[in-house]
């Protein structure tokens, strides 16, 4: 039986009077790679931010590795857990954003080592070994001493990916990680994510790169106006869409 890593049940999220997520259900098993596509404003990024607990949500439940995260139900009252528990829950996921968010005063290796030492309390020696391992995995074996300002955008994003996976999360979240890159740098980042997929990393990916989503995903989710409009295998979504809305969306993409 497959090991369930992520279980999203009827998530509702509103900003004021504007409901962004209108009851989303989604499951990922260990090793699954699921891509989320859809127009801007459809709720893709908000869903990822709810999973990572960067956003609070008003209804529903998210479980990672069988444990409810972010909220507790005591005496039938739903309450947000304390900040210490939020930090522990968030550590179950690794998230890579559009912007690289590297510390400019730290080298590539030091950026990766920081959370290993501060959060996981690993020794400097072990943290350095882990950092070097992941720099090699993302194709930057000789750039550990380089600072972010000395790296290209693609290289910085690869360091950001290495920093996230070095923490050994149960689930990786990618939020349009190539959208801030020059076109010629996109493939080097996508190739790193593909290699993680081959290695069995469980991943939920928001992307505008349709060909990449087709090639890397076990399942593709099309979000439309805060709900899952359609989901299926890459062939079902990209070659045989069943809704007019998805067909119209795909006509405006580069797939």
Regions found by a protein language model. Name each.
Residues 106-114:
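Short coil-to-helix segment of the ABC ATPase nucleotide-binding domain corresponding to the Q-loop/switch region
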Residues 147-151, 155:
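Conserved ABC ATPase signature
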Residues 231-232:
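ABC ATPase "signature
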Residues 166-170:
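A short, proline-enriched helix->beta-strand linker immediately N-terminal to the Walker B motif
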Residues 60-74:
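Conserved ABC transporter NBD signature motif
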């Amino acid at each position: 039986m497959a090991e369930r890593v992520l279980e999203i049940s009827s998530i509702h999220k509103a900003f004021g009077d504007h409901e962004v997520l209108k009851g989303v259900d989604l499951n990922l098993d260990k090793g699954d790679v699921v891509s989320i596509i859809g127009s801007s404003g459809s709720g893709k990024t908000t869903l990822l931010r709810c999973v990572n607990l960067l956003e609070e949500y008003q209804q529903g439940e998210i479980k990672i590795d069988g444990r409810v995260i972010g909220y507790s139900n005591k005496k039938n009252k739903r309450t947000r857990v304390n900040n210490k528990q939020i930090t522990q829950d968030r550590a179950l996921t690794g998230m890579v954003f559009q912007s690289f968010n590297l510390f400019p005063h730290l080298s590539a290796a030091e950026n990766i080592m920081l959370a290993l030492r501060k959060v996981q309390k690993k020794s400097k020696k072990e943290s350095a070994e882990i950092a070097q391992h992941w720099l090699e995995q993302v194709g930057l074996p000789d750039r550990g001493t380089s600072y972010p300002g000395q790296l290209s955008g693609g290289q910085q994003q690869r360091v950001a990916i290495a920093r996230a996976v070095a923490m050994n999360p149960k689930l990786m979240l990618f939020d349009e990680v190539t959208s801030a890159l020059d076109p010629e740098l996109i493939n080097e980042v996508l190739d790193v994510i593909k290699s993680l997929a081959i290695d069995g990393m469980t991943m939920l990916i928001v992307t505008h790169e349709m060909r990449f989503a087709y090639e890397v995903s076990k399942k593709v989710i099309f979000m439309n106006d805060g709900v899952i409009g359609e989901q299926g295998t890459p062939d079902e979504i990209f070659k045989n869409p069943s809704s007019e809305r998805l067909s119209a969306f795909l006509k405006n993409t580069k797939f």
